């Protein structure tokens, strides 16, 4: 198969090398520069020869992108400048589509007149006013009431505008007085005209409640920032109590469900044998080890959340204090190293050639080392004591921070105490923590208590009783010590005599 056959199959026309074709090709002008194209050989030549006209897959509509010219044959529609009636005493003009013949010469109302709605306020004359009022209000006369009703019609019951514009023969009326008079007159009017009207019950205006509401609002607006914060804190506390009450109710219901278990109808004879007892024990053990789903409806405990926040704050304070302690320890170590270097420099300057001095110098370093080791030990002890003191201080500050919102009376009522020192783990009796003295002093204290008619240990060792008992023991011990010193001085005085 030749190349011409391939061209015929692929519908490709080969390049003709006839002289007629060469003659038809345009000759370049003298001014243009002829660029020789590189000759393509091999596969590239075959690929170039396969290229033909690429037809687009999607038809492209090549239309004119400019706007069409205006059609001047269409006749423009006429517009006319006509009058319209805005209200009964005002006429304006506007443009309307259409000729004057079509629109007409009559003045039409505004298209927005349908939105101009007014309230239906009752109207009456002086005779009707005297009949339905029947002398119920002697302060307001008919002229002033009619003036008020006219203002209400003109300003659509905008009471602040009405109170601002009200000026009847120089009389001053407050906004609440105007409201009260308007609603009372309307109520008496409907009672006179239509006693069965359902609007009568809604026309009652409580003036005293309105004044009280405004005073309360003024007090709210005049609150200080401290009062607002106090109210917010009280609201938060009340919500916490509500959450705690809900939780206690849920726990109480759970306990009642546990206590009020359903009675089984099965006989107990099957559990009287050893096999039945072992089966019952296995069932109870499986029930105990079974994982129960946590109750998702239980509310979050606000006290636990607050304690977690306090614990986080406490950890931050501890980290800061530990960082400060580390800086202080580093400074102390640097000062000690500087002192040691200064001592070594002084010792090197004071060297002498004598043998005694040499021996003494040989002994000095060992002594210095011993002194340094003792100093280092003392420093370590001091560091440990300082750390313990700081920890106790942090614990006491944390406890006081937790209880700062409780007063002394509330602490006493709840029995809450902030211990400054670390307590021993486990349960103990408060009476066992009463301080004891030496046997000789203890016997004298017991004798003194018996003389006073008091027991050695309190019968009801509450917190306050134990504190007062401790104070009493300390005072008795100091008095016994003073008595001992007085007896000693009197004996010496008698010997001198």
From Swiss-Prot:
One of its GO terms (cellular component) is NuA4 histone acetyltransferase complex. It is found in: Nucleus. The keyword Nucleus applies. InterPro entries: DAMP1_SANT-like, Swc4/Dmap1. Residues 306-317, 344-358 have a biased composition (Low complexity). One of its GO terms (biological process) is negative regulation of transcription by RNA polymerase II. Residues 1-38, 286-317, 344-377 are annotated as: Disordered. Keywords: Activator, Chromatin regulator, DNA damage, DNA repair, Nucleus, Transcription, Transcription regulation. Residues 14-38 have a biased composition (Polar residues). GO terms for molecular function: transcription corepressor activity. PANTHER family: DNA METHYLTRANSFERASE 1-ASSOCIATED PROTEIN 1 (PTHR12855:SF10), DNA METHYLTRANSFERASE 1-ASSOCIATED PROTEIN 1 FAMILY MEMBER (PTHR12855). Belongs to the SWC4 family. Component of the SWR1 chromatin-remodeling complex and of the NuA4 histone acetyltransferase complex. Component of the SWR1 complex which mediates the ATP-dependent exchange of histone H2A for the H2A variant HZT1 leading to transcriptional regulation of selected genes by chromatin remodeling. Component of the NuA4 histone acetyltransferase complex which is involved in transcriptional activation of selected genes principally by acetylation of nucleosomal histone H4 and H2A. The NuA4 complex is also involved in DNA repair. This is SWR1-complex protein 4. It comes from Kluyveromyces lactis (strain ATCC 8585 / CBS 2359 / DSM 70799 / NBRC 1267 / NRRL Y-1140 / WM37) (Yeast). The gene is SWC4.
């Amino acid at each position: 198969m030749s190349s011409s056959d391939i061209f015929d199959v692929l519908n490709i026309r080969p390049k003709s090398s006839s002289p007629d074709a060469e003659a038809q090709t345009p000759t370049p002008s003298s001014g243009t520069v002829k660029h020789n194209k590189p000759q393509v050989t091999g596969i590239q030549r075959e690929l170039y020869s396969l290229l033909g006209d690429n037809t687009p897959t999607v038809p492209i509509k090549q239309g004119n992108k400019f706007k069409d010219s205006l059609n001047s044959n269409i006749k423009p529609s006429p517009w006319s400048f006509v009058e319209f009636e805005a209200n009964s005493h005002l006429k304006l003009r506007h443009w309307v589509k259409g000729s004057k013949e079509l629109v007409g010469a009559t003045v039409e109302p505004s298209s927005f007149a349908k939105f101009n709605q007014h309230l239906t306020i009752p109207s009456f004359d002086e005779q009707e006013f005297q009949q339905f009022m029947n002398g119920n209000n002697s302060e307001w006369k008919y002229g002033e009431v009619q003036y008020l009703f006219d203002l209400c019609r003109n300003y659509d019951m905008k009471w602040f505008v009405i109170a601002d514009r009200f000026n009847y023969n120089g009389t001053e009326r407050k906004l609440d007085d105007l409201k009260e008079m308007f609603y009372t007159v309307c109520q008496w009017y409907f009672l006179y005209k239509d006693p069965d009207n359902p609007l009568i019950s809604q026309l009652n205006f409580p003036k005293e409640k309105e004044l009280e509401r405004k005073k309360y609002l003024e007090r709210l607006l005049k609150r200080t920032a401290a009062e607002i914060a106090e109210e917010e804190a009280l609201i938060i506390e009340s919500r916490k109590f509500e959450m705690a009450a809900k939780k206690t109710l849920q726990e109480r219901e759970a306990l009642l469900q546990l206590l009020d278990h359903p009675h089984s109808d099965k006989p107990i004879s099957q559990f009287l044998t050893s096999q039945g007892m072992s089966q019952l024990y296995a069932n109870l053990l499986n029930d105990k080890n079974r994982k129960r789903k946590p109750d998702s409806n239980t509310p979050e405990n606000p006290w636990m959340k607050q304690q977690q926040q306090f614990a986080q704050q406490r950890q931050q304070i501890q980290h800061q204090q530990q960082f400060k302690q580390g800086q202080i320890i580093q400074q102390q170590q640097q000062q000690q190293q500087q002192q040691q270097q200064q001592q070594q420099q002084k010792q090197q300057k004071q060297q002498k050639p004598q043998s005694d001095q040499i021996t003494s110098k040989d002994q000095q370093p060992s002594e210095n080392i011993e002194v340094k080791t003792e100093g280092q030990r003392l420093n370590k002890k001091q560091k440990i004591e300082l750390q313990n003191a700081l920890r106790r201080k942090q614990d006491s500050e944390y406890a006081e921070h937790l209880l700062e919102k409780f007063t002394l009376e509330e602490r006493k009522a709840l029995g809450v105490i902030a211990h400054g020192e670390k307590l021993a783990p486990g349960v103990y009796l408060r009476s066992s923590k009463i301080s004891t003295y030496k046997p000789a002093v203890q016997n004298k204290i017991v004798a003194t208590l018996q003389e006073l008619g008091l027991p050695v240990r309190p019968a009801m060792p509450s917190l306050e009783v134990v504190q007062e008992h401790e104070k009493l023991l300390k005072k008795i011990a100091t008095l016994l010590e003073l008595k001992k010193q007085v007896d000693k001085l009197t004996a010496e005085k008698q010997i001198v005599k």
